[in-house]
UniProtKB/Swiss-Prot annotation:
Required for maturation of urease via the functional incorporation of the urease nickel metallocenter. PANTHER family: UREASE ACCESSORY PROTEIN F. It is found in: Cytoplasm. The keyword Membrane does not apply. Keywords: Chaperone, Cytoplasm, Nickel insertion. This is Urease accessory protein UreF. InterPro entries: UreF, UreF_sf. UreD, UreF and UreG form a complex that acts as a GTP-hydrolysis-dependent molecular chaperone, activating the urease apoprotein by helping to assemble the nickel containing metallocenter of UreC. The UreE protein probably delivers the nickel. Pfam families: UreF. It comes from Prochlorococcus marinus (strain AS9601).
């Protein structure tokens, strides 16, 4: 088994590499409005996000970031590629609907950059203190030589695992139910990942009005951050 194949497990762990925390991303609002009542409703929420949520756009940008890193490594159009990298990063970060979600992204990105630095890979734009989570994820996968498809699959898996970790604390659904949901999500994660591979950014449709409204209450609810 290759080293890169083993390193991907470090990335997808619900406890690592981002300091053993996960964010509920507005899940409490769904609970407050009685839209989350059991494991089935949690599963449906996560599936809907995988099918039409903004997480799809985040996943698609992983590919663009990955290709830019590749061109920079080959010495192609350094100035232009760095500008494109920064522009895409600022764009995806600004697309987040609330300050809390943007700060969450920055926090998680910093933790992942710290991890890759410990492995000997210092990020190209180290002076940029406000990067997005997708950028940091793509950088880690590029450094660890993880394939593009695995990069997207792992991204979706890690995101869904964190949502389930949050659900365990606020509903709760129970650890066994959470594991069963994660198992049931594998097929949709595989399907959606392959779809993302074949699409351009402009072809990615997402509608997250419900999630955006839920996140508006993020700063007023008591369980926005969990530490393991």
């Amino acid at each position: 088994m290759s080293k890169s194949h083993l390193l991907k497990y470090l990335l997808i762990s619900p406890n690592l590499p981002v300091g053993g925390f996960c964010y509920s991303e507005g899940m409490e609002s769904y609970l407050h409005n009685k839209n989350l009542i059991d494991s089935n409703s949690v599963k449906d929420l996560i599936i809907n996000e995988l099918k039409i949520g903004q997480i799809r756009l985040d996943a698609r940008l992983l590919l663009d970031f990955f290709d830019i890193f590749d061109e920079i490594n080959e010495g192609k159009n350094l100035k232009g590629n760095l500008h494109k990298l920064m522009s895409l990063d600022k764009w995806i970060l600004s697309s987040k609907d609330t300050l809390e979600i943007r700060e969450q992204q920055i926090q998680m990105a910093k933790s992942l950059f710290d991890l890759t630095k410990e492995f000997g890979f210092e990020y190209l734009c180290k002076n940029n203190k406000k990067s997005s989570w997708p950028l940091a994820w793509s950088w880690a996968c590029y450094c660890f030589k993880i394939t593009k498809l695995e990069m997207i699959e792992n991204f979706f898996y890690s995101w869904s695992a964190n949502q389930l970790s949050a659900a365990l604390r606020i509903i709760p659904i129970g650890a066994t139910k959470a594991q069963l949901i994660q198992r049931d999500l594998l097929a949709i994660i595989s399907k959606v990942s392959k779809e993302i591979m074949d699409k351009e950014i402009d072809d990615i449709y997402f509608g997250n009005v419900g999630l955006a409204m839920a996140q508006q209450n993020h700063n007023d609810l008591y369980t926005k951050l969990f530490r393991n």
